[in-house]
Amino acid sequence: MSIVVGQAYQHLPKQVSQNPDVGGWSFLQYFSEPKGIVQNREDDTKKTAYVYPIEKRSVAKLSLEMCTESLGTENGSDSGDEMSLLALEATNISKSPRLTTKPQKETSFMTRENSFPPPLNSVNGFNNSRMVKSYKEDGRLVVQAIRVCSPPRCFVSERREGRLRLCLSQNSLNSQDAEEEFEEEDEDDQYDAEEEEEEEEEEEEEEEEEEEEEEEEEEEDEEGIVGNNENFEGKSGNKKVSNRPKRRCNENGCEPKTMLNWKQQQFWVTT
């Protein structure tokens, strides 16, 4: 009897392991195993996982690309690997966020135009300062270096009793006096030129007046004289009097007195 009972107990654990859902002790034994716990968790995550529709579309695109790759390899083209790489790069680039690049401002450089003629090193080497003068001669441009004296000092600084004093230099005073004299000479020259112009205008007016007077005298002579240089008789008697006025030149704008005292008279003509 003891042998039969022992054999029965030996069969019990095998049945429990094969049928874990039978009885309350089998339920505890099932959860005590780590493999069963992990499998249950994986099953739960697979059932509860949610897939976004955007990801589904991307998966569909990948499947289409894979199909085209397989078709290309079947046709015998060698560009299947290259196409797959390009497709993967395209998907990676599309997923990566685009960086906004700011437009770079165009920097414009201003070119400074130097004055003509350019500075010469040989001219700068001398002690006396020089200037360059340009002029045209026979249709050519001539550049000439001219010596220029150094500008005079206007102020002279001196230190006395811990103070700095500024005094006008003698050169500056002399230069100011020379400038004043030069200005006075210019004014005198302008005044003299104006006087000469006025005198010339007066002389021209006098000459015009003299010409007009001479024309009037000639007209009067033509009216009072008839014939070729004949003697005329006056009212006083049979005396022959030549009452023809004498013509004189006007010198220095002075009119002859005889012409002023002469009066028009009536004459009898004899034939």
Curated annotation (Swiss-Prot):
<dbReference type="InterPro" id="IPR046431">
    <property type="entry name" value="FAF_dom"/>
</dbReference>
<dbReference type="Pfam" id="PF11250">
    <property type="entry name" value="FAF"/>
</dbReference>
<feature type="compositionally biased region" description="Basic residues">
    <location>
        <begin position="237"/>
        <end position="247"/>
    </location>
</feature>
<dbReference type="InterPro" id="IPR021410">
    <property type="entry name" value="FAF"/>
</dbReference>
<feature type="region of interest" description="Disordered">
    <location>
        <begin position="174"/>
        <end position="255"/>
    </location>
</feature>
<comment type="function">
    <text>Able to repress WUS when constitutively overexpressed, but have no effect on CLV3.</text>
</comment>
<feature type="domain" description="FAF">
    <location>
        <begin position="114"/>
        <end position="168"/>
    </location>
</feature>
<protein>
    <recommendedName>
        <fullName>Protein FANTASTIC FOUR 1</fullName>
    </recommendedName>
</protein>
<feature type="compositionally biased region" description="Acidic residues">
    <location>
        <begin position="177"/>
        <end position="224"/>
    </location>
</feature>
<comment type="similarity">
    <text>Belongs to the fantastic four family.</text>
</comment>
